[in-house]
């Protein structure tokens, strides 16, 4: 009798059940594994959202407007695309955005490159390429997966250099805290959008019966 492959348990701290992790394990292996070298750290975070995957993905894919769900961004402007004459808002891998960060953080600006925008599989990735901040060589991937009929799972991972004078734990704590806050905002925005869409699609109530 052939022995079944044993599914490894979810990574510690991810907050997923064994059954949930089994559903997204292939996604984790394909998109959320990094070759972490000396002086680097990485992390993987998860967020359940009670909204259809399409509603969540519609928010995540907005490389041109991350402030919709990212707390600490004041503004975002797409750079002109040197490879296309239209210079419109088309989102293609290689596009750059200039992000302005709110005061109070150890950053002021960030130049970021869109690496991956896969609408079919709902995979989004970007790299920080410049700016005034301490997150050097920061690279992130976000995936949107359906868990069941009413629940979507968002996974966000990153790899980044540990700044001089900081430890891996310090760096991971800072980045994880920002991402958790953003994922919580993503949850509230996506669920509100889904509820509004459902309400708009609902048939109108029948007119009241006429009095006899």
UniProtKB/Swiss-Prot annotation:
<protein>
    <recommendedName>
        <fullName>Abscisic acid receptor PYL10</fullName>
    </recommendedName>
</protein>
<keyword id="KW-0675">Receptor</keyword>
<comment type="function">
    <text>Inhibits the protein phosphatases PP2C06 and PP2C09 when activated by abscisic acid (ABA). Together with PP2C53, SAPK8 and SAPK10, may form an ABA signaling module involved in stress response.</text>
</comment>
<keyword id="KW-0963">Cytoplasm</keyword>
<feature type="site" description="Involved in interactions with PP2Cs">
    <location>
        <position position="167"/>
    </location>
</feature>
<dbReference type="GO" id="GO:0042803">
    <property type="term" value="F:protein homodimerization activity"/>
</dbReference>
<comment type="subunit">
    <text>Homodimer. Interacts with PP2C53. Binding to PP2C53 is dependent on the presence of abscisic acid (ABA). Interacts with PP2C50. Binding to PP2C50 is dependent on the presence of ABA.</text>
</comment>
<feature type="site" description="Involved in interactions with PP2Cs">
    <location>
        <position position="106"/>
    </location>
</feature>
<dbReference type="InterPro" id="IPR019587">
    <property type="entry name" value="Polyketide_cyclase/dehydratase"/>
</dbReference>
<feature type="binding site">
    <location>
        <begin position="134"/>
        <end position="140"/>
    </location>
    <ligand>
        <name>abscisate</name>
    </ligand>
</feature>
<dbReference type="GO" id="GO:0010427">
    <property type="term" value="F:abscisic acid binding"/>
</dbReference>
<keyword id="KW-0938">Abscisic acid signaling pathway</keyword>
<feature type="binding site">
    <location>
        <position position="70"/>
    </location>
    <ligand>
        <name>abscisate</name>
    </ligand>
</feature>
<dbReference type="GO" id="GO:0005737">
    <property type="term" value="C:cytoplasm"/>
</dbReference>
<dbReference type="InterPro" id="IPR050279">
    <property type="entry name" value="Plant_def-hormone_signal"/>
</dbReference>
<dbReference type="GO" id="GO:0004864">
    <property type="term" value="F:protein phosphatase inhibitor activity"/>
</dbReference>
<feature type="binding site">
    <location>
        <begin position="107"/>
        <end position="112"/>
    </location>
    <ligand>
        <name>abscisate</name>
    </ligand>
</feature>
<dbReference type="GO" id="GO:0038023">
    <property type="term" value="F:signaling receptor activity"/>
</dbReference>
<dbReference type="Pfam" id="PF10604">
    <property type="entry name" value="Polyketide_cyc2"/>
</dbReference>
<comment type="similarity">
    <text>Belongs to the PYR/PYL/RCAR abscisic acid intracellular receptor family.</text>
</comment>
<keyword id="KW-0539">Nucleus</keyword>
<dbReference type="GO" id="GO:0005829">
    <property type="term" value="C:cytosol"/>
</dbReference>
<dbReference type="InterPro" id="IPR023393">
    <property type="entry name" value="START-like_dom_sf"/>
</dbReference>
<feature type="short sequence motif" description="Latch loop">
    <location>
        <begin position="133"/>
        <end position="135"/>
    </location>
</feature>
<keyword id="KW-0346">Stress response</keyword>
<dbReference type="GO" id="GO:0009738">
    <property type="term" value="P:abscisic acid-activated signaling pathway"/>
</dbReference>
<dbReference type="GO" id="GO:0005634">
    <property type="term" value="C:nucleus"/>
</dbReference>
<feature type="binding site">
    <location>
        <position position="156"/>
    </location>
    <ligand>
        <name>abscisate</name>
    </ligand>
</feature>
<feature type="short sequence motif" description="Gate loop">
    <location>
        <begin position="103"/>
        <end position="107"/>
    </location>
</feature>
<feature type="region of interest" description="START-like">
    <location>
        <begin position="34"/>
        <end position="191"/>
    </location>
</feature>
<keyword id="KW-0650">Protein phosphatase inhibitor</keyword>
């Amino acid at each position: 009798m052939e022995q079944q492959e044993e599914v490894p348990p979810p990574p510690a701290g991810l907050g997923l059940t064994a059954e949930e992790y089994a559903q997204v394990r292939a996604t984790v292996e394909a998109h959320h594994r990094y070759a972490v070298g000396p002086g680097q750290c990485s992390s993987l975070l998860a967020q359940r959202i009670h909204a259809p995957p399409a509603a969540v993905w519609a928010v995540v894919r907005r490389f041109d407007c991350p402030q919709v769900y990212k707390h600490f961004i004041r503004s975002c402007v797409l750079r002109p695309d040197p490879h296309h004459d239209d210079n419109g808002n088309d989102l293609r891998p290689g596009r750059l955005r200039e992000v302005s960060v709110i005061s109070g953080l150890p950053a002021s600006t960030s130049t970021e490159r869109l690496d991956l925008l896969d609408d079919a599989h709902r995979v989004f990735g970007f790299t920080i390429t410049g700016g005034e901040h301490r997150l050097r060589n920061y690279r992130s991937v976000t995936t949107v997966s359906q868990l069941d009929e009413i629940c979507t799972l968002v996974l966000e991972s990153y790899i980044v250099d540990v700044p001089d004078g900081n430890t891996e734990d310090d760096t991971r704590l800072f980045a994880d805290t920002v991402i958790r806050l953003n994922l919580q905002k993503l949850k509230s925005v996506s669920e509100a959008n889904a509820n509004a869409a459902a309400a708009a699609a609902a048939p109108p109530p029948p007119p009241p019966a006429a009095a006899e």
